[in-house]
Regions:
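Short, compact, well-ordered microdomains
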Residues: 64-103
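Negatively charged, low-complexity tracts enriched in Asp/Glu with abundant Ser/Thr
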Residues: 2-56
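Short, charged, intrinsically disordered terminal tails
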Residues: 105-107
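Amphipathic, interaction-prone secondary-structure segments
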Residues: 47-73
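A generic structural signal for beta-strand entry/edge sites
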Residues: 20-24, 60-62, 80-84
């Protein structure tokens, strides 16, 4: 379920970085592993994505997202304190580039 834009929490991002070779968009932010959803849900809403699946383990969160028919993964690893969006196909890298433009307003 998507929240109306008036109900979207503000997100705070320190930096973003695109990596075409890894088909990824790195997101640097203050993220609490135990409260990952508090960071991820507003992020997903700001990107106008839909959450299809949520998985987590001892040190990692992985959410399957969809953006206009493109499947993406939102990943967070506790020990490396790294968060990134990834695409499966090289043809979908332009989606990551577009999403990066949306995140720039949150820097």
């Amino acid at each position: 379920m998507k929240l109306p834009s008036s109900h979207i929490k503000a997100i705070s991002i320190d930096a973003i970085s695109l990596d075409k070779n890894a088909l990824s968009l790195s997101i640097s932010a203050d993220i609490d592993f135990d409260r990952f959803a508090d960071f991820a849900e507003p992020l997903v809403a700001a990107l106008d994505c839909t959450v299809r699946e949520r998985q987590w383990g001892a040190d990692r969160h992985q959410w399957l997202l969809e953006f206009e028919g493109t499947q993406l993964c939102l990943n967070y690893e506790f020990y490396g304190n790294i968060c990134w969006l990834s695409a499966e196909r090289e043809a979908d890298f332009d989606v990551l580039e577009y999403l990066a433009t949306l995140l720039k307003s949150h820097l």
